[in-house]
């Protein structure tokens, strides 16, 4: 697990490695009382969405053909609509979840529905237990979002792209990840022609 302390009293940024993420997904899959937890973790790590954005997700906003889902203004922190692109991992998690919903609460409008078909409201206990089973300490649900952003920046993705994917209203918030970019300075100066 990696962490970054921020100046000015801002909250910490924690992220986990890919092997820790695999262990967490495996541990989340054993949560008998929260069978949707595994797919929630997979989707959060693949999209960077906030917990409430995912828990409020309805099937009619998921477009499997175009590989994205829509977050409406009332579901986002900054009140702006956004399209969330889906990679193969996110699509797989959504398909698995669709399967579960079809078997246990067919007709539910919620992606993360309980067996009664109602929207899942809280994952905290199951998530904490899954972290313990995976041997991951001091890791919150929101840290799945930090993990997504950290992985992207470490892969060289522009902070502006990460900002848009996370739905940040300002690049200032996203800049907390800037130091993770492996070659941000080196790549910039290479764009200049030699004199």
PLM features per residue range, with description:
Residues 1-51, 55, 65, 76-77, ...:
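Basic, Lys/Arg- and aromatic-enriched nucleic-acid-binding interface segment
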Residues 36-38, 44, 137-155:
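Short basic/aromatic active-site micro-motif
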Residues 19, 23, 82-85, 92, ...:
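DNA/chromatin major-groove-contacting recognition/catalytic segments
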Residues 61-68, 137-138, 157-176, 187:
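Short, polar N-cap/turn motifs at the start of nucleic acid-interacting alpha helices
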Residues 7, 15, 71-78, 166-191:
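Catalytic-site neighborhood detector that most strongly recognizes the C-terminal catalytic loop/helix
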Residues 19, 66, 75, 87-137:
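Active-site/catalytic core of tyrosine-dependent DNA strand-transfer enzymes
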Residues 43-44, 57, 151-155, 165, ...:
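Short alpha-helical segment immediately N-terminal to, or the first helix within
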